[in-house]
Amino acid sequence: MHLEHLMSSTTAVSWSKIGLIAYGDAQSQDGNLCITFLETVNGSNWRFHPPKKYVIHPQLHEDQSSNGNPKSPLFFHDLRSMHWNNWGLLNGELLAVCDELGNMTVLAAGQGLNGNGAYDRLSVLFQDNIFKIHNQVLPLESVPKKDATPKVERKHTKKEYYSTILDFQWIGNQKPSVAQVAAQRDRTNNIFKNQMHQCPPYGVFHPASIKSACIAIRRNGYIDLWYQFSNTLDFKKISLQLSKDKESEWLQYAQIAHTDKEQCFLIGVFSNVAKSFAFYELLINWNVNTTNQAMFHDPKLTLRHILRVRPDALGPNGELLKLENFHVISKTALPGTRPEILISYNILGTERSLVRRFQMVLSNPDMVFLSSLGLAITALHNNHSVLRYSMKHVQDLTFDSKIMDIQSHSLDALVCFRLHNGRFQLYNRHTWAVESETADAKQIGGYTKDTIISIFGSGFNYPLLPPADAIEWCAISPSSGGIILKLKCKPQPTFYALEQSVLTDPSRDIVHATAFAFEFVRFNNMIHSGEDLAIAAKTHVFRLQRLSEERAVNFIASVIGAILSLYGIHFDGPKEILEKLLQSKAIQKIFLLQMELGSHLKNKNVYSMAYASMKLRSINLAMNGVARNVHAMIQHTAVVNSLPNGRAFQFAFSKQDLIYSLIPSVNWFVSFVTFLTQQLIMLVNNPMDNTHSLVLGILSCITTRHLMLKVILELKNMIGLITKFPETTYTVLNESSRFLRKALGDSPVNLEKFEVFLNEINNKFLSLLDDHGAQSMDREPSFMVKAEIPPALGHVREFLLSFAGSALLAQTNLAEVFFASTHNLRIFDHQHFHPSVANLLQPPEKGLVVDDAILPDACRGSSSFSPLDYDDISSEWVDMSALVRIKRCVRCGCVTRAGNPVAKNNTILETSIVTKRWTALYSRYCQCTGLLYELDTP
């Protein structure tokens, strides 16, 4: 197979770290770019969202809305590669699209002329048509589903263009990164700890004066550097030719990699003319003005040819070799690492492959050789210019099948070889050994592993793929969770999740859970969304559930516990540290993972505990944010009232409208406290009842106790503000304050007494647990996940029930509480999805990502997956089916209007003022951190 096909099959798809997937369409007559993403159907099953199709052509900068006929016909070409800016700590929101001619277009997800929006909308930032850059920012409209007269025609070509881009790289910023080395078991307490390094930026990275930058190399040997200064929207370009020799005018392939030198790229090319490899060093001087930060200067490029070598014709044992693949891998973030050069050969007459691994090293020529040339050795002995690069042969790797492509993965810590027989082999960059484990299914009990370097080292691997001839393109998902591929016979991609061959040995569950936790922490530190890893973990949970329900739940608890351990999160510290922990993105991601792993289990508490925790955290942030804004508006109003022509109404209205927007969340919290009290009534009357045990987990878990106390504290703070600063000029606006008081007054449970009850539990709980030596790292995952008290802590259960009976229930109207409605809680997984798709759509062994053909005919659209009668972020019952713009979360499936303008009929008064409510925080991301996308309402 020719390398041109190998490169196009690998780079024809790009999966962003935020979850968007871009791939080329080589057949359609009305578009060449597809954008899709994985979305949950029912909490456990997923599907690829119907792709939006776009036309990327060289004339995008022209007026797209013009209906006039252009002077010359417009054509679009096949796309050769696409690249999200996933490198390092970049945000993954920019997409570079390169067509076969060499035109390069940069698109931005979630950005438009009117500001930020949902990520499923694209805008063009700039386009390079080889000879000219067009810096016109414009929205990119998707191709209509029914358009009989496309304005742009597809133009196929069989030619190879000299301007084709062979390799492309995004350049990272100067933020330091965290490199995870391994999860190491601490034998004193049998807990895995995270071994990590805080690494400074390495390789090539741009300074703060540059907003974004990228680099590419073309077939004709030209290097292009695009960059955007932080004070402008326009992009600039610097071009540089490798050499003026004819051999660099027609390159067969090229690679760009970061080196161990600061601000230096290693460029490797293979000339189709000279039939040899050439290597260059490219140094980038960003030309930062250190004396005047406001003055920006263009970067400077310095290119140096360092080596030329020819490919091997014979193998180590005299085999005839044919050059087949070439890959240069960047150095890793860890100090002391170097770029690696991999040259792949087919062994002629066989199906086997040989990969020769090299490193570029500096060496001093032999002095005897120099003296034979008549050079003065004494003059050259201390001259550093004598140092020359050479390729040091390090290792030969042999494979029993032809290599389809080579991909560096896991932040370049792993190298993945996809073979023609459908299998994958992954090598660790630090050991260059196969990163896998030969699992013995007969080994029962006593299994242990002290070091986990990656999930593949614990026995997980990618499944066998379909025949290579049936695959159009294939790539590894960003967080290692599986393989995305496009079959030639199917219109949409397919996802193959990681799988584990050994399931019958329960002693391996801890190691397997820690392996998932290690990858979760690794990629969460690099701002990955991680839905692919969640699907792989959920697949493993279902396979365990077939063997034992208890093992499946224990596995989830082990995953959550391992994540907390690897993050170093302890809940026994001071209250201030606990508050910061609960506000962190890591805790938010942990709640989401538990929700995803806990859906469709027999133990409903796993999902409900995570959802309740996430909801309490969201309400706490909303209360805190509104209180701070209300306090600021009170100060604004005081200033405006002192002015002769001040507009006090707008500030007063905005303040009261913010308060009004909190009322649904207050109603939810009141219902939640009522629900917990109802469960306490049931348990006090029947202590052996396990169907109402969620309250035990809520009261035992320190995170939920603390969050409930924080919400009550914020409510008291809000009531204090509206009592101390009522509206005197526009008294009608006080209605929202009255509604808030009424929502609290309608609670059948006295919230002040409930607060006292929680504080007393906090005070007595620690002494009860400390008496039995239970550590938070052991007990918290059990409380957080299982919502149950272990048998060893049975005295804690007895205390909770007896104390609840005397301290709370004895002072409560039990009949009023017991018959109160709590229908608006929606804390169970099936309540978030339409009944037609709420159950599993196919057996888990067939995969959790389903085709559209599996879905019921009436539930093919995304708007039919979740009920459209409830806004899960604002906690408000509202018929959203009639609204023009609503959003859905790809992870938890909630539907919301967050981030959109508030309708006049949903404010305290009809007014032309458009307020910015607290829900505007969730214009792009859901409260669970999932991606929000706009629904096509029926």
Swiss-Prot record:
<comment type="function">
    <text>Component of the Mediator complex, a coactivator involved in the regulated transcription of nearly all RNA polymerase II-dependent genes. Mediator functions as a bridge to convey information from gene-specific regulatory proteins to the basal RNA polymerase II transcription machinery. Mediator is recruited to promoters by direct interactions with regulatory proteins and serves as a scaffold for the assembly of a functional preinitiation complex with RNA polymerase II and the general transcription factors.</text>
</comment>
<dbReference type="GO" id="GO:0070847">
    <property type="term" value="C:core mediator complex"/>
</dbReference>
<dbReference type="GO" id="GO:0051123">
    <property type="term" value="P:RNA polymerase II preinitiation complex assembly"/>
</dbReference>
<keyword id="KW-0539">Nucleus</keyword>
<dbReference type="Pfam" id="PF20719">
    <property type="entry name" value="Med16_C"/>
</dbReference>
<keyword id="KW-0805">Transcription regulation</keyword>
<dbReference type="GO" id="GO:0060261">
    <property type="term" value="P:positive regulation of transcription initiation by RNA polymerase II"/>
</dbReference>
<protein>
    <recommendedName>
        <fullName>Mediator of RNA polymerase II transcription subunit 16</fullName>
    </recommendedName>
</protein>
<dbReference type="InterPro" id="IPR048339">
    <property type="entry name" value="Mediator_Med16_C"/>
</dbReference>
<comment type="subunit">
    <text>Component of the Mediator complex.</text>
</comment>
<dbReference type="InterPro" id="IPR021665">
    <property type="entry name" value="Mediator_Med16_N"/>
</dbReference>
<dbReference type="GO" id="GO:0061629">
    <property type="term" value="F:RNA polymerase II-specific DNA-binding transcription factor binding"/>
</dbReference>
<keyword id="KW-0010">Activator</keyword>
<dbReference type="InterPro" id="IPR048338">
    <property type="entry name" value="Mediator_Med16"/>
</dbReference>
<dbReference type="GO" id="GO:0016592">
    <property type="term" value="C:mediator complex"/>
</dbReference>
<dbReference type="Pfam" id="PF11635">
    <property type="entry name" value="Med16_N"/>
</dbReference>
<dbReference type="GO" id="GO:0032968">
    <property type="term" value="P:positive regulation of transcription elongation by RNA polymerase II"/>
</dbReference>
<dbReference type="GO" id="GO:0070202">
    <property type="term" value="P:regulation of establishment of protein localization to chromosome"/>
</dbReference>
<comment type="similarity">
    <text>Belongs to the Mediator complex subunit 16 family.</text>
</comment>
<dbReference type="GO" id="GO:0000122">
    <property type="term" value="P:negative regulation of transcription by RNA polymerase II"/>
</dbReference>
<dbReference type="GO" id="GO:0034605">
    <property type="term" value="P:cellular response to heat"/>
</dbReference>
<keyword id="KW-0804">Transcription</keyword>
